[in-house]
């Protein structure tokens, strides 16, 4: 009430500045006790620097785009992504998102005041603001002009539940990789032209293990390690009793065969015997097996090749052979990897290098698609091209599996009113089980068992992701990897181990940044392209877009300039002027531009990764470079002297700040950073509303007061260590 915070600003006018950046929370969710922890650390340093004579400006911010908002609105409206544009217009949906994203602003403001956190809530930066978006467009144009923005068709993490691709830093948020128990199978791939010693005892097979049996119908190759030793083994199938000779890695022989059975005679075996005899009859190096052919394991669909014009034809014998791959190991499995190029980045890489086709479907639009659609189920027959079905699909075999969800988590019956029943999904029989049972009945399964393995999940839906071929826009962050590593060494990390370890190792293993998001509420990608993709333009400002629209009007592609119609004046940067327009979908999608050759250009439909929004805040919060250019260029507001957030931001906000600063400005975005630990319950478990162990910050402050709470949080453990929160002390 005495406006002390504002006075601390005015009384330090003209003093040296201490630059601090506030990471933007999303106001569509309630604040938690962990926010008190992070804000206590931030407030402590900022107040200390103020007392030491510095002016410490602290602009609040709101993160307003992206999956958290969209999924919340879908739940509230009882719709799915597929309903948008059908039962509800994009304009109506985005209006609901804009309203929903700020619904807990009052509670956030209330907590800010109650805990005594000094931050400027009167003039916050808001990521959905048109001026904020304009700065993002300017940054993207800088990347585009440097050749760091490109479009590629690659295998990417994809969340069927969220309906969009994910970046590697989203996939590496804490808790995204989880141990799951899945049905696995060692498949038997029947050889076509075996070596003589492989054909002397029963049917010859290659053995390959997979934790994702649903990908086996998309298999087009087997991969062996060039330096791995392999053996041919005469034995019997444990399920059917069939005589067989199998090939697998020598180092894994006793993983699949009981050493006690080594001395048993093959001829003495009787079906049902627990000990199955075996005999090694040949040894090979990986290259000895390369080029050998096998029969398609699950012949539902024949592979096709597609030319540059989109014309397809049945693949002429390139598939179903053994190829080499350096990444094959003998840590688990059989030392032979099943290759489904449409569902794995490594698979796609080695297949492409060896000239192996991917197994694609052709839909009614003539487009090539994987066997699984974007919702996570096998394509329905009536969604496919009739000629393709007639020539390449075994309808009798495939029809039983069409429309089946590859993971139960994607099946809508296990999500009611937006709540996913993970236990029910896990208890139900999965497609993997059905495929394994089908293989067992057809004598194509050597071993079926449950296996616990680490699998990635979507950071917002908590459901498993797929690796899926996507047409996406990427930032070529790998081109600047060495510079990012070099600049990271100049940052003062607390703890230092986070900078050199978690963050440093992340930079060393950097992938290109998947920027595209196939959603509705977010910053639109400012790239327009001709239909044949021969010409494109990247827009870097509203004024540039305004001028390009004028050219389009003159060319007859647009009736009028919607920005001019609304009275928008280019170059006037006040809020009143920018509130006349909306840079979001669907309005920006309605804009048709004209290419240099006079062709119409439509906007690429994607939005950009919401993490780019927050990583761009040093520039977008001041509408750089359209306003306040001198402030930033003279280093009055950039880089930050200090930032602080939870350790979960290491591969989130900390990374995107660093990446954008390096790639656009060849600098760091911050000089010092505290990465605080997690706030756990008193037993050391992660807090969760679902588990009922979350601590309400409002009632805690009401009962104990804000100063005791702040003191407890910063003195009970080092800021970077996890805190076991216990009100009993």
Task: Identify the function of each model-found stretch.
Residues 1-241, 340-345, 350-353, 360-376, ...:
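N-terminal, positively charged nucleic-acid-binding surface of large information/translation enzymes
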Residues 31, 380, 415-426, 492-500, ...:
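Short histidine-centered catalytic/ligand-binding loop motif
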Residues 92-100, 325-345, 487-503, 694, ...:
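Extended, non-catalytic structural segments that build the interaction scaffolds
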Residues 151, 245-247, 370, 380, ...:
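A sequence-level detector of short linear motifs
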Residues 282, 433, 439-461, 587-606:
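Short acidic, Pro/Gly- and aromatic-enriched capping/linker segments at domain boundaries
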